[in-house]
Amino acid sequence: GYAPPYIANFERDPAVPTSNQDVELIMNITDYDGTVDSVAIAWSADDTVSILNMPIYTLPLSPGTTDEYEYEIPAQTDGQTVRYYIYAADNDGNESWWPVKPTAQTTPNVEFYTVRDNGMMVYDIQYTLNPNGSSPLAGQEVTVKGVVTSSTKIGDLGYLYIQDESGSEWSGIWCVGIGLNTYYR
């Protein structure tokens, strides 16, 4: 058939691991007009390794399921960024990637996370390797600490901004939501 394997319900747990936590990846992969022939993950904690040269590991079907695949990335050191992508092919040679790779693009896109022993930083929300500029934590509820640099109070900017104490690039964020008027700088 013409349809490639469909990768859905992707989960990474934990979203921001500590250096003593393995990271579990779980997803469902189905092929609606054939069978899933192979599933693999490429990952690296070495940012000098190009995406196309990352080691590749086969993902087995989870026992007792017909479409669930799992992989565990071993614990990494604090501050380490881990990049990865999932690849699936069906019996007709059709291919799929997670995250999605445009047809004309030769290099797969990657998901990534940074290991943090002292909790998430604003940098982890803002820094991205995604070509579309979206956060690696888009759609997830997160807790982050930061220094208030602007508040919603009268005489201030009227918006709540926080940043990491280090104040380097990617380290500031505009906060939206309920209860923001209780923060001061």
Task: Describe every region a protein language model picked out.
Residues 1-21, 106-185:
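OB-fold nucleic-acid-binding modules
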